[in-house]
């Protein structure tokens, strides 16, 4: 089938390169180190964020490969939670539960859990999540590492989240976790798996082929590429040399709103496919300052009028797609951006992002609200050991995205699986975030506050006001005079308090109490949601319910 050609082609390339470097790598190297990735979870990364921020040249493209951060992450985490030399206690509360190792191989495995009970005030319902799964990772020899995880879930969510999941836009897609099916009357049943094979071809090249997510930036959110959406197949090639790190990412996405059957397209079945080729070039300007350049192209695999099939031109590994796009008279969706990070002191750093979907410089200067001036920015600040209190971190962030950014006239928008590939709010929003995180020994506490303003579409109105990236931008409200929060202006104040006790740092297994207050006000609705829960969970993954 033609929609599989992209990854069949990439897998053939990967397998040839893999086996070539496999034998040459074993011949020239007798060192053993894991090429597995650090988890993307914000909570997990609070354990090591300060060390990574100050001692790693390149921290933007995530998940970070363990050996690329110049730190022994496992030792750092273990040292922070050591103190009991009892073998059984050490195994249960510090390390993976299953360990198989030899001179040139290592396999680790642990269960993944999220057993949660809660209560929500609007519907006056008891909420719960029942997650069971596993994680397995390891290495064979000095070049090959692997990772796989699987979780199966049943959940009843608080009212605001349940309502969003059931909207036609989301169509039963659980944020970041795939499509669910009905579980009894008001719950969802859903599952998620991920995995990859990692190969260190040399001191300069690392290849990863698998099914997962990525994140570009140093903040809580990303405007370039985030782990907000569901997993996807990918090929990642990371090149590191001197003051440069260059990453190629090729991915396949699905459009759940376009189901192609044998009746209307004889050689396609299932959901419509689209592909992304992305480049990220990071340069270390100094010991304190790092700058990154990002670009991506998304194109469709659909042989209808005005659409492209698989286009080998976008396998070009060299940065700057615009000349390629122009040379083939492309109607595809291109995004470019910058990310910056500056270490102010050994305890603090500034970071920023700038994203351009498309814009006209003359219209931008005239400030007349031209609809196609589609851009956004992020600016953030982190301060570690605030007030000289060890492990107290302050995190501030602002995000701003103009209407219609990331959207397109066809399904080559910047989305996957009914979700946004960048920010969960889509476009036409501003957001201010404050996070205070504190850890002492195994005690883990966090306070998070978000102030959000966005302009949404009106129910029953076919006009797009620029928030929903899946809406055709040709159905816009006007060409000029497009201001921020165009449409149904909505305000959200979201506060979340978490108090936890870490049982095992390897999987960030913790007992956690959570209290959430969400206040939404708009022209049509006013809701005050209060939700609390207690859980036993492996907190390795980001689940973005804070919008």
Regions found by a protein language model. Name each.
Residues 1-37:
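Bacterial Sec-dependent N-terminal signal peptides
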Residues 35-290, 295-303, 364-375, 382-400, ...:
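Outer-membrane beta-barrel channel domains
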Residues 1-4, 64, 169, 318:
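Generic low-complexity segments that are intrinsically disordered, proline-rich and/or Lys/Arg-biased
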Residues 33, 190, 284-547:
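Exposed, low-structure sequence patches enriched in small/polar residues
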């Amino acid at each position: 089938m033609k929609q599989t050609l992209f990854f069949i082609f990439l897998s053939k390339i990967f397998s040839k390169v893999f086996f070539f470097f496999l034998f040459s790598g074993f011949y020239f190297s007798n060192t053993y180190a894991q090429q597995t990735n650090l988890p993307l979870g914000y909570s997990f990364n609070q354990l090591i964020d300060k060390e990574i921020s100050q001692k790693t040249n390149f921290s933007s493209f995530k998940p970070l490969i363990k050996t690329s951060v110049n730190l022994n992450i496992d030792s750092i985490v273990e040292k922070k939670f050591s103190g009991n030399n009892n073998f059984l206690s050490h195994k249960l509360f510090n390390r993976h539960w299953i360990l198989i190792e030899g001179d040139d191989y290592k396999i680790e495995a642990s269960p993944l859990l999220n057993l949660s009970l809660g209560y929500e005030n609007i519907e006056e319902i008891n909420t719960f999540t029942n997650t069971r799964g596993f994680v397995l990772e390891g290495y064979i020899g000095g070049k090959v590492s692997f990772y796989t995880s699987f979780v199966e879930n049943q959940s009843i969510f608080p009212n605001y989240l349940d309502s969003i999941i059931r909207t036609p836009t989301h169509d039963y897609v659980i944020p970041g976790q795939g499509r669910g099916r009905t579980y009894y009357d008001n719950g969802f049943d859903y599952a998620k798996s991920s995995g990859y094979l990692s190969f260190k071809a040399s001191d300069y090249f690392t290849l990863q082929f698998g099914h997962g997510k990525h994140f570009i930036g140093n903040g809580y959110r990303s405007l370039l590429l985030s782990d907000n959406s569901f997993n996807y197949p990918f090929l990642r090639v990371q090149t590191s040399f001197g003051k440069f790190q260059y990453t190629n990412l090729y991915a396949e996405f699905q459009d759940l709103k376009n189901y192609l059957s044998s009746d209307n397209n004889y050689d396609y079945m299932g959901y419509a496919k689209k592909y992304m080729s992305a480049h990220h070039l990071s340069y270390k300007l100094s010991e304190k300052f790092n700058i990154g350049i990002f670009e991506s192209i998304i194109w469709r695999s659909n042989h209808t009028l005005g659409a492209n099939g698989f286009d080998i031109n976008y396998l070009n590994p060299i940065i700057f797609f615009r000349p390629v796009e122009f040379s083939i008279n492309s109607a595809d969706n291109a995004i470019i951006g910058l990310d910056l990070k500056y270490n102010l002191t050994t305890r603090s750093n500034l970071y920023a992002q700038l994203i351009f979907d498309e814009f006209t410089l003359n219209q931008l200067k005239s400030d007349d609200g031209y609809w196609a001036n589609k851009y956004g920015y992020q600016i953030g600040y982190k301060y570690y050991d605030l007030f000289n209190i060890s492990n107290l971190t302050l995190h501030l962030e602002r995000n701003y995205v103009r209407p219609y950014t990331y959207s397109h006239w066809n399904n080559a928008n910047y989305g996957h699986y009914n979700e946004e590939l960048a920010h969960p709010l889509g476009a036409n929003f501003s957001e201010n975030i404050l996070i205070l995180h504190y850890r002492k020994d195994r005690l883990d506490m966090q306070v998070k506050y978000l102030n959000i303003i966005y302009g949404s579409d009106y129910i029953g109105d076919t006009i797009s006001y620029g928030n929903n990236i899946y809406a055709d931008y040709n159905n816009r409200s006007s060409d000029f005079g497009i201001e921020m929060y165009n449409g149904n202006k909505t305000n959200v104040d979201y506060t979340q308090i978490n108090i936890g006790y870490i049982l095992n740092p390897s999987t960030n297994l913790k007992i956690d109490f959570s209290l959430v207050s969400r206040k939404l006000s708009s022209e049509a609705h006013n809701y005050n949601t209060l939700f609390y829960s207690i859980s036993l969970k492996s907190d390795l993954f980001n689940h973005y319910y804070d919008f």
